[in-house]
Amino acid sequence: METIDLKGNAQRGLEAFTVAYDAELAKQYFKEDYIQHNPGAPQGLAYSLQMIPMMKEAGTTTETHRIFQDGDIVVMHNSILNAAPFGGDSFVVFDVYRMEDGMVAEHWDALTPMVEPSFGNSQIDGATEVTDLDQTERNKALAQRAVTDLFVNGKVETASQYISEEQYIQHNPMFPDGFDAFVSAMETMKTQMPDFKYVKAHHVWGEGNFVLVAGEGNNNGTAMIIYDLFRFDDGKIVEHWDIIQPIPAEKANDNGVF
């Protein structure tokens, strides 16, 4: 039985919109009734197809910086340029696709404007190679525990159990590299942003050294989507990318963002 290239199909599906600008090609990779969790997009493929002429006119393009697979889930770390149809100049986005029969059947995402780095690392650069496939389940479990201990429960004293003290590369543009900087940032947030809460991790998707945790937060009454991408090495987090996105009160579909 021929194995379907799910990562390839997910990427080709995205590029049908942002490289080929081809609705008929997109229909080959997206189910007509695919489940949409983006709060700004209605359910199904029809709305997305309507965006193609606007993307073509704007010259909207995407680039995939990281891609990995967890069963029928494909995770992509993308950038969007010339992104006027999406309400800005450029964005960084995590796109998560659930594949069925080789086609996209469900989609989650989180996006944030691309900004200039404050401490040297951009929101998209860094390691890309998926390695340590035999460590997938271990790393997923570690990521789940790290988010629970550090972000949900605020146990900064447990940081050394999860974060490498030798190398920690930070891609959040607000914070510098390093274990000490991570601990300092956590302490600062606890004192200066007491109304920011990480409520719950809803999904943990991973392959090898990469794990994406999709979680829910709340900032002074505003619900938030929080996606954290971790790269592990020898059981410790050595690199981190993230996106925090407010959840609008009015949503274009009834599927929920998680």
Task: State each model region's role.
Residues M1-F258:
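C-terminal and inter-domain tail/linker signature
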